[in-house]
Amino acid sequence: MTISNKSWRSYFPHLRKLPEDDQYLYSDDTNSSIIAEEELHHSVDKSSKTDVTAETTAVEPHPHNLRHDLPYEVRDEAGRKWWKYFDEFEYRVNKEYKKSRKWYEFLYPNHTTQTKAERRLLYKLDIIIALYFFMLCWSKSVDLNNYTNAYVSNMKEDLNMKGNDYVYTSTIANVGAIVFQLPFMYLLPRFPSHIILPVMDLGWTWFTFACYRANSLAELRAYRFILSAFGAAYYPVSQYILGCWYAPDEINSRVCLFFCGQQLGSVTSGLLQSRIFKSLNGVHGLAGWRWMFLIDAIAISLPTAIIGFFVIPGVPSKCYSLFLTDEEIRIARARNKRNQIKDGVDKSKLAPLWSRKLWKKVFCTPAFWVLVVFDTCSWNNMTAYSGSYTLWLKSNTKYSIAQVNNLSVIPACLGFAYVIFCAFGADLFRCKWIFMVFAAIMNTVSCALLIKWDIPSKAKWYAFFTTYFSVAASPCLWSFINDFLRFDPQVKAITWIAIYSFSQSTYAWIPTLAWPTVESPRFKTGYTVSLIFGAIYGLWTFVVLFFYKRNEKKHALGNGIILYDSNKGEELPEFVKKNMEERDGYYYLKRSS
C-alpha cells in the first residue's frame, strides 16, 4: 500500500507488505554445500530466494551463490604487497567498482548497478533518516549540555551543590542509561524502531520538563537518572538503523550528520542558556536555568518525538515508511544484498535471548572484544564532554555568566569542522583508519598541553579548541562496528548494545575518578587519563583494521572477488573454469549457468 491510498493507514506508519515478501524475507544464512570452504578460503552467506537488481528486475540466484548481475575479479594473492594491509577496501570491493567510482561522487558513490532511482532513494533517505537523526542527536545534546550550562548559571548555588556533586550527578545519570539499554537486546530485532524511539523520547521529554522544578539535589538526580534511562536507546538504535540503509562507503558521512547534531547541541545549549538567562531570569519567579529545561522539553524534545513516529522507516525488510514507494523499498533490499547486509529475521526464527549458542556467537568472536576495547577507549578519551573548558572559563573572574555561556560554544563550533573532515574524508578516500589515527594524535597533543598547564595563553586556547578531536572520528568507529556486524541482525542488536553498554559503564566511573570537580579547573588527572586512552585508541586502530580485513577476506566472494594463492600451490577454483567466462578482464556467470 502506498501513501496515495486514502484509507487511514495511509496517514500512519504501517508495515509495507510487498507481493514478493513471502519469498524474499528472512532466508537462513547457511554456507553453500557446492563450493568447498577450503577451496574458496571464505564463508559464503546463502542468498535469499529472489534477487532484485537496482532496476528491480528479479533474477534467479545461481546455485553456487554467484550472481548474474555482478562482474567478478579473480585475484591471485601471490606476491601481495605489504602495504596492501593499509588498503581498507582491499577485500570489500573489487577493481571494477573502484574503476567505476568517481571521486567527486563520494556522497552517492557510482556503481554500474546504480540507477537514477537508486540515487533518488538515497536523496530520500538523507532527508527522512539522516536529517532526522541529526535533529534527534541535537535535541539530546541540547539537554545534556544544558546540565553543564545550568550548573554555571546558578543551579549550583540554587541546589546547594558542593564538591563533586556535579560529576556524581552525571555518573548517576549514566548508570540509568546503561542499565536500561540492556532490554533492547531483546526489543530491537523484534519491535519496530518507529515505535521504540518515539516512545522513549516522550519519556525523555517528560523528565526534561520535570528538571525545571527540582528543588533539591536528590530530586534533580532522580530526574536525571530516569531521563537518561529513557535516552538509553537512541545511540545504539539510531546506528543500527543507519547501518541497515547505507552502504559502507556512504555511512560515514551520514553518521557525521548525527555527530554534527551533537556539536550543534553543544553550541545552541550555551547560546540559548545565555539568552534565556539574560531575558527570562526571574520571570514568574523562575531562575534562568529552570526556563531552559522548560523550553528544551516543550519546544525541542516533544516535537522531535512526534516527528520520529512518522519518519523513522524501520529497516528495508520490515519497512514502515510513509514516504518510500514499493520500488524504492525493493531497491533498498537489493542494495543490502549487494553489500551483504542482512537487516531482518522473522520473529519465529530468532533464537531465545537466553540461548547459549546465541551468546557464544557474540562473545566467542574475536571482533567483539576488539571492538569493546576500541569503543571503551573512544568513550574515555573524550575531553570534549568533560566540561573542563566551561569550568575553566567560570574560574576566570573576568568573564560574566553570559560571557561564559557564549564562549563555551567555541570548541563545539570547531567540532563541526573536525567531524566533517574525518567523516567525509573517510567516505571520499574509502579509508577510515587514517582519520582515526590523525584525530587520536591531535587529541593526545591537546591533552599533553593541558597536563603541563603552565603554558602560554595562546597554547592553552589552542589546546582547548582542539579537544573536539577526541570525538571527531566517532562516525568512523561506528561505521566499522556496523560493517563488522552486518551479517546477522540478532547478533548485531545484542553486540551493539553489549559494546555500547560496557563502554558506557566504564564512562560511568572513570570520569568520577579522573575528573573530580574539586580539581577544577586544571584536571591534571583527567587530561592524563584522556591522553592514555587516546594513545591506545590510535594504536588500537591498526588491530581493528587487521580483524576487519580478515573478516572481509572471508566474505570476499560476496563482494565480487574470487581469491586463490598460487604460492601455496592453489589453482583457479574449478567452478570458475566450469561456470564462468571472462569478458574485458572480469569473470561473469555463463548465460546458460
UniProtKB/Swiss-Prot annotation:
Signal peptide: none annotated. Residues 143-166, 212-224, 313-361, 430-432, 482-492, 548-593 are cytoplasmic. Coiled coil: none annotated. It comes from the Eukaryota. The chain crosses the membrane at residues 122-142, 167-187, 191-211, 225-245, 292-312, 362-382, 409-429, 433-453, 461-481, 493-513, 527-547. GO terms for biological process: biotin transport. Its main location: membrane. Keywords: Biotin, Cell membrane, Membrane, Phosphoprotein, Symport, Transmembrane, Transmembrane helix, Transport. One of its GO terms (cellular component) is cell periphery. It is found in: Cell membrane. It is a multi-pass membrane protein. The keyword Hydrolase does not apply. InterPro entries: MFS, MFS_trans_sf. Residues 1-121, 188-190, 246-291, 383-408, 454-460, 514-526 are extracellular. The modification Phosphoserine is found at residues 32-33, 43. GO terms for molecular function: biotin transmembrane transporter activity; symporter activity; transmembrane transporter activity. SUPFAM superfamilies: MFS general substrate transporter. Belongs to the major facilitator superfamily. Allantoate permease family. Involved in uptake of biotin with the concomitant entry of protons. PANTHER family: PERMEASE-RELATED, VITAMIN H TRANSPORTER. This is Vitamin H transporter. It comes from Saccharomyces cerevisiae (strain ATCC 204508 / S288c).
